[in-house]
Amino acid sequence: MSAPRLSVIVPVYNGRLQLPRCLEALRVSEFADFEVLVVDDCSTDNTREIAERFGARYLRTPRNLGPGGGRNLGAAHARGEVLIFVDADVVVAPETLDFFAEDFQKQRDVSAVFGSYDESPAWPDFLSQYKNLMHYYVHQTSSERAVTFWAGCGAIRADVFRRLGGFDTDKYPDPSIEDIELGYRISMAGGNILLDKRVQVKHLKKWTVRGLLRADIWLRAIPWTRLILETRNLPLDLNLTHSAQLSAGLVGLLMLGLLLLPSVLAGFFNSWISLPVLTAAVAVIILLLLMLNLRVYAWFVARRGVLFTAGAVLVHWSYYFYSGCVFALCFLEHLLRPHREAALGAPRNNLPAGMAG
């Protein structure tokens, strides 16, 4: 059986600094039978000139649609049997397309495939290194049989993508969890999703504290929690393992203990908790957190040293804290929604008197 023809779709918005590296990597790919479609989401720079210089098919959205809308537009014009989505700030390896083609050629029951970032992030600063390395570790240690999808570098059979309607840009107009939600639909439709750990790509993004918090909380944690509650589907993989859930709860208890510490030192609450008991409880929680996450912290020590890992632990526990808070608040919102909808009742008729049907 011959390898499938591939269509590589690259959504981009003002990507003049990163798009050339992305397209150059595709141009020197070891795989031969593929096309590249650059979907320009109303950029104001020279994106078109860059795309045409590298021989890519150029498409432009009628208005700003976000990456999900750009991918959908590219898919509508693609000629390949397999659609490969590559972010404009991603550099594929020479063998990346070969791996995708091989997966779909040899495993006819596979509907979608995705990979991970590599362990050599482009930017040397701590936050960019940590964020991309944590992504690499989570994907590389997760099950190969996934129930979600990742569009940073992921592929879907064209017929499956079109049958399911592509990315839901009505629900997720901004870059969010539109890829995860599509993965849910693929899985619920009976499709198989493969996490191919050979597919590793370089991420060119430089992370900032503000950008990380916005992405982690507003663009990921909140919509993903709502999706989990709506579908009642909590996949115990990637960032949602039992140990991750338990760690989030423990970090919440740790924060509570640290908040109580000044009051206990001042003599408050002595009737029901003493300083030695609180100190011991905090120490036990810290020990449990270190034990639960020992593998990833040992992995960081081996690759970046003790000092880097100490910072990684603090950022990791911060992630557990705000993710746990988001889940708790969204769960409360989910519980209260039926009561709120019942209180609102039927919609009012605002037509003038005598005009109602």
Which residues fall in each region the model found?
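Conserved donor NDP-sugar-binding/catalytic core segment of glycosyltransferases
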Residues: V91, E95-L127, L204
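Glycine-rich, basic loop-to-helix element that forms the pyrophosphate-binding segment
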Residues: T61-A78, F99, W150-A151
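N-proximal low-complexity "stem/linker" segments adjacent to membrane-targeting elements
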Residues: M1-V28
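Membrane-embedded multi-pass helical conduit in multi-pass membrane proteins
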Residues: G249-A328, L332
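Short aromatic/hydrophobic "clamp" motif used to bind/position activated sugar donors
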Residues: L83
